[in-house]
Amino acid sequence: LELTTLPLAALAAFMMTRTSSEAGMKFLIIGAISSAIMLYGMALIFGFTGSTTLEGIAASFQEPAQTVFGGGVPAFGSFAMLVGVVLLLVGFGFKISTVPFQMWVPDVYEGGPTPVIAFLSVASKAAAFAILLRVFFSGFFDVSLDWAGLMAALAAASMVIGNLVAIGQSNIRRLFGYSSIAHAGYILVGVAAGVKATGADSNLPEFISVGPDSVLFYLGAYAAANLTAFFAITAIGNRIGSDLIEDYAGVARRSPVLAAILALALAALIGVPPTSIFIGKLYIFTAAVNADLVWLAILGVVSSVVSAYYYVRI
């Protein structure tokens, strides 16, 4: 995960302009801070479990398997151990750009080269989510009900704030930055749903992979739609020489093919049936309902409707 940070920071500053250099520096500094927070959390976890492997950490929770707030697990029954897990989650929050760890996203999206930002919005996020799933579902699943609520809260905040702030953006790249925050929230709904479903009733094995499966499907759908949108934005931006949404007026007349590609990508990002993101959202929100997270599913649907406003405005 860290090996992706340094080259992406260099690529973000590749254009050597003021905004590009600022984007690269912000990405590097925020990446370093998140790495330090994660390492401190890992140190605390190692200190209380005596293991650096996910299997060893998971084994320390087996006898007996209780939650932090219920007590009873020697390795996980201390406040310091809980802090370690929270710090680990905070570090991942920076990597996947969730609220309230998203402050770097709009500036980096606006200042970095568009092809680099397209890669960053997909590859970096996918890698971070893949590792998050591996770490928390393999190493901390026996105490998952302790962090599932935090995942749900992060998902709700990211969906609401990401979509609401995106409405007021005039720069299309900043708009996509806030949009990526909202999409991170949708993905976290699947993470929280997978945990809640399995933790709520162990007699429902069919729910075990619903959350992770929905996350992986949505990541693939989001990657395809987002890369397509950035391809169109790059081509249109080179022709009109501007990233302002108001300057996109008349693009359908001057470049009908590019406008059509962008329109299809935006329809997919909204989740218009029968696009892949619609299927992904249906998968995620169904998992949330099955996991008794109905409020989160409703919030996700409302947030999707809000996102349609600023996507259609483009």
Q: Can you name each region flagged by the protein language model?
A:
Residues 1-314:
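Alpha-helical transmembrane segments of multi-pass membrane proteins predominantly involved
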